């Protein structure tokens, strides 16, 4: 957990853009309900959560961590969180679907009064599976790849006021966006876009869609 705090602080130091969401961040944080951030793989759910909490005192648990999962003990984990993050106001549970029976544990934390932000992309996080345990306790926040305005913003161009000298660049970005989409990683590394998208496509179809619908033959 201490190493995860160091990773959290490193991620918070990197440059990002503010994402567009249905609800303003300050309104979300004021709500005592569970903030559930879902969406496809690699669209920036964790980054959005970190940015939303950047100016607050928050604790962080990343369940995309085999060591944490292999040695998981709820009581020890919570005590360690309180030791590492003194008097934290929010608790961010990243990729929490990797924890067996995560929904029951999250509900328990909610009942204890923790203000929770959780992220997940696996098929197990989809609304149908959550309906029984979390009903009435969470606010859904759907994340998607960058929109075209967000893509333009990444290049330090205000999409609402494009200078004449930047218009050719924006047209080029629009063409690339139509061909490649708006996944954050390919915006940063266009040269590797096709290979990255191919791998991502396989992951989403073979791991998420096939698993959710119990498709055995994916040929």
What would you call each of these model-derived segments?
Residues 92, 115-121, 142, 151:
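Structural recognition of the conserved hydrophobic beta-strand(s) that form the central parallel beta-sheet
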Residues 59-90:
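Short glycine-rich substrate-engagement loop in P-loop NTPases that contacts/grips substrate
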Residues 37:
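Hydrophobic anchor at the beta1->P-loop junction of P-loop NTPases
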Residues 45-46:
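Conserved lysine of the Walker
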Residues 1-28:
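A short, basic N-terminal segment
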Residues 1-9, 149-219:
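Interdomain hinge/linker elements that couple catalytic modules in large macromolecular machines
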Residues 124-140, 154-156:
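Short regulatory helix/loop adjacent to the ATP-binding pocket of P-loop NTPases
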């Amino acid at each position: 957990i201490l190493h995860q705090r160091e990773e959290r602080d490193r991620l918070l130091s990197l440059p990002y853009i503010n994402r567009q969401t249905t609800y303003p961040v300050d309104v979300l944080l004021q709500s005592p309900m569970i903030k559930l951030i879902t969406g496809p793989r690699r669209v920036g759910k964790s980054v959005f959560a970190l940015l939303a909490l950047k100016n607050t005192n928050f604790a962080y648990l990343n369940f995309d961590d085999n060591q944490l999962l292999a040695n998981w003990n709820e009581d020890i984990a919570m005590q360690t969180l309180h030791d590492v993050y003194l008097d934290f106001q929010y608790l961010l549970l990243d990729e929490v679907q990797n924890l067996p029976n995560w929904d029951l544990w999250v509900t328990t934390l909610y009942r204890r009064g923790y203000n929770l932000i959780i992220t997940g992309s696996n098929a197990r996080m989809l609304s149908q599976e959550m309906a029984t345990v979390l009903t009435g306790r969470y606010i859904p926040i759907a994340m998607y790849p960058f929109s075209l305005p967000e893509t333009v913003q990444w290049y330090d161009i205000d999409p609402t006021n494009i200078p004449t000298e930047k218009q050719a660049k924006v047209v080029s970005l629009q063409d690339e966006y139509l061909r490649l989409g708006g996944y954050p990683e390919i915006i940063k590394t266009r040269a590797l876009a096709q290979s990255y998208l191919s791998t991502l496509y396989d992951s989403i179809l073979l791991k998420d869609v096939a698993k959710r619908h119990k498709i055995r033959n994916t040929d």
